[in-house]
Amino acid sequence: MIEPVKRQLSSSGAQLPRSSGRGRTVARKLSDILTGHPGRAAVTMFALVITGFTALLRLPAVSATGESLSLVDAAVTATSAVTVTGLTSLGPDAFSLTGQVIILVAIQVGGLGIVTLGVWLTLLVSRRLSLRTRLLSSESLGVSKLGEVPALLLTVLIFTLSIEALLAAAMLPVFVTEHGPAKGAFHAVFYAVSAFSNAGFVLETNSFDHPVVLTTINIGAFAGALGFPVVYMLYRMVFHRAAMNLHTRLTLEVTVVLLVLGAGLVAAFEWQNPMTLGQLSPLEKVHEAIFASGMTRSGGFSTYEVMDQNDPTLVVTSVLMFIGGGSGSTAGGIKVTTLAVLLLAILAEIRGDEHIQVHHREISSSLVRVAVAVVTAGALLVLTAVVALTAVTDQGITVATFEALSAFGTVGLSTGLTASAPEAGQWILIVLMFVGRVGIITLAAGLAARSTPTFYRYPTERPIIG
């Protein structure tokens, strides 16, 4: 049972054992990052962690051949693991057990959230959470009330480890039967972490032949894509009889609609395709279609080659990848609540409503402005990346667009472009994965100069729209 922290941390902090001088030095440096601008702190921490894992993956012991990986291969793998994407330039057999363990740790760090782990480390060493740190945590986790941050941080940790343990236990008998106790246990843990984190990393190319593994991974990816704020809200509803907030309601509604709609479209377009669903039984087709629909919004696992799909399915998959999962989750994309706010704004405009209302709540115009900014900036970024990818590779616009959307949405479904692209193309995909995980608005805020308040306003005019 998830038991979040009951007490709010005071300004002086919870009393913990005193740390060593070296620990205080580390804490001070970490605190300097965490107490800066929230957006800049998140960007800095992600960049530092990715750099660290890139260095680790360049060690000779990581490679199955004993030779050091190239800088770009290590950077692609590290970025993909920390951003829980799944796009790689190397196959799963390119890594030794040491390399697989490092990738597993990187996925777990990225899935839990670098900011979350940084805040926990700060709390353990310095014994307090400053207001700035709470602001950073609230922005990273997608909560609006600073008082909920400590409880949510503990909920994130307990829920993540509990779900991953359950997923591993469900898959353990299958993998032990196939690989033996030790290797089977490692496979179960690896796929549990990869599924819940929506990372899409695999240890073997034929890992999803068993229906138990397929179903377990689908459930894990679905839970991970909901977002920690939703999980925390559901916990409070069950154990504290709290009322469901609007964010949770919209996230659940849009997630279910997209899952069902995506599965229906995949089944309709691929039902007779012998390369994907055509040779399966009707029940297996439905199961595979649901799995494919869930994986397109961040999971990144696939039971068949992406390019074997028909063109309409590629379009549907591309749209779902751009949307992504829930805010504060392991998923990327523009997020399902962003889509919901935009659709509600369009509906209100069509109806002529002065205010945007849903479920007896009103959505502010400032939130609509943020949603428009997220979608527009994301679309422009992907468009720019597609142009750049087509310029540096010999692939057409379909392949480049799919790969760019997969990187931006931190999905991991691949046409093979990540592995075949020249270094320039791979660095483009690295940037997309980084921005997709950090969030384009967070990145912009982190890179922007300190804002200067204005004490005046200009006259209002209305340009012609449409």
Show the residue positions of the predicted features.
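Membrane-proximal intracellular helices of multi-pass ion channels
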Residues: 1-466
